[in-house]
A protein has these predicted regions:
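Nuclease and nuclease-like effector domains acting on nucleic acids or nucleotide cofactors
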Residues: 1-115, 150-186
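Histidine-centered nuclease catalytic patch
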Residues: 107-142
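Activation segment
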Residues: 127, 149-150
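Cys/His/Pro-rich metal-binding microdomains
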Residues: 145
Length: 186
C-alpha cells in the first residue's frame, strides 16, 4: 500500500464537505464560500505533497456528494484544479501559506510580481451581477489582492462566456444569465 493513502483518502471527505452543493446552498452570509475554497486548496496541496492525485481526491469527493459525472461536479473539479495551479504559481504552497489556507484565510504571495500581497478568493462572475453564484465554489478563483480590487464588478468576455456555459448545463438560471448579459452590455 502506498504511504499515506488512507490519510490522502481522508482528505476527500474534507473536500466533499467543503463543496457539498446542499451545504453551499444554505450559506446565507455574503462570500461565505471564499474560505471554503482556501481550505480546499490546503487539502489538495497536502494530498499532492503526500504523493496523491488531487484530481482523484476531487473525483472521490464528487462521488460522496453524488455529483460525479454531473455538470456541478465537473465545474467544481476544473475550478479546484485551476485554483491549486494558481496557488502553486503564486508561491502559496509553503508552511506559512498552508497554515493560512487551512484556516480559510488569505495566504501571502511569495512568487512573481505580486510577491508580498495576499491572494484572495474572488468571483469570476461578480456577486453584484449575479448573487445566485455568490457561494458557488466553481465561481471562485484566487487572485492577488490588487487585481481583485481593480477588477471590481466588471463583466467582460470571460464572464459572459462562463455565464453562458453555466446556463447551458443548468448551473445558472435564465434570470441569472439575463442579469450577467445586461451588466456586460454596459
Amino acid at each position: 500500500m502506498q504511504k499515506g493513502v488512507d490519510d490522502i483518502s481522508f482528505r476527500a471527505c474534507w473536500i466533499a464537505a467543503l463543496t457539498d452543493p446542499e451545504k453551499l446552498g444554505t450559506l446565507s452570509r455574503e462570500r461565505a464560500a471564499n474560505p471554503r475554497l482556501q481550505k480546499c486548496i490546503y487539502w489538495l496541496a497536502t494530498v499532492k505533497q503526500r504523493g496523491g492525485d488531487p484530481a482523484k481526491i476531487i473525483d472521490d469527493a464528487n462521488e460522496q456528494n453524488k455529483v460525479s459525472g454531473k455538470p456541478y461536479g465537473e465545474f467544481v473539479k476544473a475550478q479546484l484544479l485551476r485554483n491549486l495551479k494558481i496557488a502553486e504559481e503564486l508561491g502559496l504552497i509553503n508552511p506559512e501559506g498552508l497554515a493560512e489556507l487551512r484556516k480559510g484565510n488569505c495566504a501571502t504571495i511569495t512568487l512573481g510580481p505580486y510577491k508580498g500581497e495576499e491572494a484572495t478568493a474572488d468571483h469570476i462572475i461578480p456577486r453584484a451581477a449575479c448573487p445566485e453564484l455568490d457561494n458557488q465554489i466553481f465561481n471562485l478563483e484566487l487572485l492577488p489582492a490588487t487585481l481583485n480590487s481593480s477588477k471590481s464588478d466588471k463583466i467582460g468576455d470571460r464572464q459572459l462566456d462562463f455565464a453562458k456555459k453555466l446556463n447551458s448545463v443548468g448551473l445558472l438560471s435564465a434570470k441569472g444569465l439575463e442579469a450577467v448579459l445586461a451588466k456586460g452590455k454596459r
